């Protein structure tokens, strides 16, 4: 069975065609600058990337270009669109309505639209992608996989904020969490990799990318996570502030003469390690800067690592222990220095690190020593494969 996985942003679209029987990626790519001038990147398995400049006024034209590339006579991955058996869509926010993935129906889409307020930057783009696929691929079953769904098992004590309860009742203001597809995939995969029973386990997943979040997974269920109503809460990130004193918003607004949108723009796009360093949101640049003696780059790495360690410590308390810590995503998988700094704070848990293993790159690595009281792993995430698996499970 072939599943087309679609991840729509406001001006970009990522896609993969996955054979669910072998879990092989048949083709993948990216549409960029939708609504501007348009660029399609397409790569069939085993071949070089092809980049085509092409107008994409809307998401529908972008998806049409993807479908045309998939069946191209020379470089297509399939002979005809009849070989696409299902489509899996990433949907950022499912609110409280969706605790799991769902087959896309008119009723389901209406329920997703009701969550628009919770993710105004993402949900409209997700819906545009879904509707474009429905128009271009009528009759093909489609599934929505929600970033928030995995975290819907959190207890009330973890998701309620210390705000007037009526805001929760009226507006559903609460912690939702994000990156759920990744947290779910990695927690299941690390248990399998280590031969552990996930239903009798305490796992902390650190999804550290430009957007970063941590989750506490007790017996296979999420009991807490660092992102909140929006992806702005929690860890210090690439350009997002993470947790701050809320009164800073008023303070900065007055000092800098900004309105609420201006302050939110600073917190979302000009803060995090980029804001601290004044250099970059990319950890490769920060490491180079630190090695060259840039004190602010060094400070950014320290602040980031310290916040990760603090969250891990709090989730050890939330679960009354931990068996496994799994690092994943761009920084989690590729920045040994960050893992090393984070784990240095966690010696009290009886963690000992195999520095040689920590320096390696590759699939599924244990980086703790055999006598470490907590097993620490690096597990590459694969959100597209997770979406394909969810899609197959519902369509079959």
Regions found by a protein language model. Name each.
Residues 9, 89-92, 208, 322, ...:
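Glycine-rich beta-strand-to-loop/alpha-helix junction loops that act as flexible
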Residues 218, 224-259, 265, 329-360:
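Catalytic phosphate/nucleotide-handling subdomain of diverse soluble enzymes
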Residues 12-56, 228:
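Short glycine-rich, Thr/Ser-proximal phosphate-binding strand/loop in the N-terminal lobe
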Residues 150-254:
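Glycine-rich phosphate-binding loop of actin/hexokinase-like ATP-binding domains
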Residues 70-122, 143, 149-158:
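Short beta-strand-loop/turn "lid" adjacent to the catalytic site in phosphate-handling enzymes
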Residues 265, 272-276, 283-318:
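Adenine-nucleotide phosphate-binding core of ATP-dependent small-molecule kinases
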Residues 1-4:
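Extreme N-terminal starter segment of soluble prokaryotic enzymes
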Residues 298, 302-323, 332-396:
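Internal helix-turn-beta structural module
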């Amino acid at each position: 069975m072939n599943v087309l996985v679609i991840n729509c942003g406001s001006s970009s679209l990522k896609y993969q065609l996955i054979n669910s029987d072998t879990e092989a990626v048949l083709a993948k790519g990216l549409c960029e600058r939708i609504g501007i001038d348009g660029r399609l990147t397409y790569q069939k398995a085993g071949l070089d990337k092809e980049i085509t400049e092409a107008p994409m006024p809307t998401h529908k034209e972008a998806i049409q270009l993807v479908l045309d590339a998939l069946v191209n006579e020379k470089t297509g991955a399939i002979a005809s669109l009849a070989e696409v058996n299902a489509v899996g869509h990433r949907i950022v926010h499912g609110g409280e309505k969706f605790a799991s993935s769902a087959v896309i129906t008119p009723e389901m889409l209406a329920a997703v639209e009701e969550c628009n307020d919770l993710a105004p930057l993402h949900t409209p783009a997700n819906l545009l992608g879904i509707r474009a696929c429905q128009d271009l691929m009528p009759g093909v079953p489609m599934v929505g996989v929600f970033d928030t769904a995995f975290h819907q098992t959190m207890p009330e004590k973890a998701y309620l904020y210390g705000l007037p309860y009526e805001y929760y009742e009226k507006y559903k203001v609460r912690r939702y969490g994000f990156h759920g597809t990744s947290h779910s995939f990695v927690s299941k995969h690390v248990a399998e990799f280590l031969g552990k029973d996930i239903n009798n386990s305490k796992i902390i997943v650190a999804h550290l990318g430009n957007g970063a979040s941590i989750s506490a997974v007790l017996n296979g269920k999420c009991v807490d996570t660092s992102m909140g109503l929006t992806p702005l809460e929690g860890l210090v990130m690439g350009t997002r502030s993470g947790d701050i004193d809320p009164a800073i918003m008023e303070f900065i607004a007055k000092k800098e003469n900004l309105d609420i949108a201006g302050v939110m723009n600073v917190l979302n796009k000009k803060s995090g390690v980029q804001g601290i360093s004044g250099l970059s949101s990319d950890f490769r640049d920060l490491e180079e800067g630190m090695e060259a003696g840039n004190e602010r780059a060094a400070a950014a790495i320290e602040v980031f690592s310290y916040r990760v360690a603090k969250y891990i410590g709090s989730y050890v308390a939330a679960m009354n222990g931990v068996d496994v810590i799994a690092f994943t995503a761009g920084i989690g998988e590729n920045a040994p220095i960050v893992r090393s700094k984070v784990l240095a704070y966690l010696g009290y848990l009886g963690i000992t690190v195999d520095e040689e293993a920590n320096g390696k790159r590759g699939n599924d690595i244990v980086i703790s020593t055999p006598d470490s009281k907590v097993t620490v792993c690096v597990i590459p995430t694969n959100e597209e494969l997770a979406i394909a698996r969810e899609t197959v499970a519902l369509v079959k």
